[in-house]
Amino acid sequence: MSKFYIENINLLNSEKKNNILSELNLLLSNYSAEERISWALSHLPHTQIMSSSFGIQSTVLLHLIIKKKPDIPVILIDTGYLFPETYNFIDFLTNKFHLNLKVFRSTISSAWQEARYGKLWEKGIEGIDFYNNINKVQPMNFALNELSVQTWFAGLRHDQSKSRNLLPYLSIKKGIFKILPILDWSKDKIKDYLKENNLDTHPLYNNGYSSVGDTHTTKKHMPGMLEEETRFFGLKRECGLHEN
């Protein structure tokens, strides 16, 4: 299927669009992560970015993509509440890989938010959803518009949570192609790739964290816990960036 034809999927009706996406997802399911990235870089619209939380295993997708497209814009949504170790990790990886880092934030500072709304993360699921909307969803939507993004690479995986185990490799959200190259990778495959390529993990990994977000809504992984229970007090897994 040609690049020209794929770019025009958005002009088709829902049924035809879904049929083509099903065919492409079947194709991508037989590819390796590297082949998926190469295919996407060649066939999907060329205003391309990747997003990264610079979390525990984020180095994997960064490494896979920048080998093929070193100057790809890397979008970071900074809530102002990341761990100090995360900010240091961002600086370290940006310098090491010469990342084309693009940082976006809420138009309301974290201090002003607390003055206006209080500690939203302590106000149940509604407070968390509102917090995520103004600190993550709105800045990401601004970033996608500001950079005129047509194709979005992200590092989601099926085994990360129940909410992610049915995700497709390729989807279209608000007219933007979203590709998940390591969707079928297991934790063991992630660990093997990190070791084989001598890549760095987040500093908090060795302190018992399996997932890292904001300081106030991230817990260490304890025996018997699911990974998704380490975030948002177990009330939810997604921060809103990857929800429909």
Curated annotation (Swiss-Prot):
Q: What class of enzyme is it?
A: oxidoreductase
Q: Which UniProt keywords apply?
A: Cytoplasm, Oxidoreductase
Coarsely, its chief localization is: cytoplasm
UniProt KW Oxidoreductase keyword: yes
Task: List, from the UniProt record, the residues annotated as the active site of this protein.
Answer: 239
What the entry lists under Pfam families is as follows: PAPS_reduct (PF01507)
What catalytic reaction does the record list?
[thioredoxin]-disulfide + sulfite + adenosine 3',5'-bisphosphate + 2 H(+) = [thioredoxin]-dithiol + 3'-phosphoadenylyl sulfate
Write out the annotated subcellular location: Cytoplasm
What is an example of a GO molecular function annotated in this UniProt entry? phosphoadenylyl-sulfate reductase (thioredoxin) activity
Which GO biological process entries does UniProt record here?
A: hydrogen sulfide biosynthetic process; sulfate assimilation, phosphoadenylyl sulfate reduction by phosphoadenylyl-sulfate reductase (thioredoxin)
Pathway of action = Sulfur metabolism; hydrogen sulfide biosynthesis; sulfite from sulfate: step 3/3
What is the designated name of this protein? Phosphoadenosine 5'-phosphosulfate reductase
Question: What protein family does this chain belong to?
Answer: Belongs to the PAPS reductase family. CysH subfamily.
What does it do? Answer: Catalyzes the formation of sulfite from phosphoadenosine 5'-phosphosulfate (PAPS) using thioredoxin as an electron donor.
Q: What is its EC number?
A: 1.8.4.8
Q: Is Oxidoreductase among this UniProt entry's keywords?
A: yes
Gene Ontology CC terms: cytoplasm
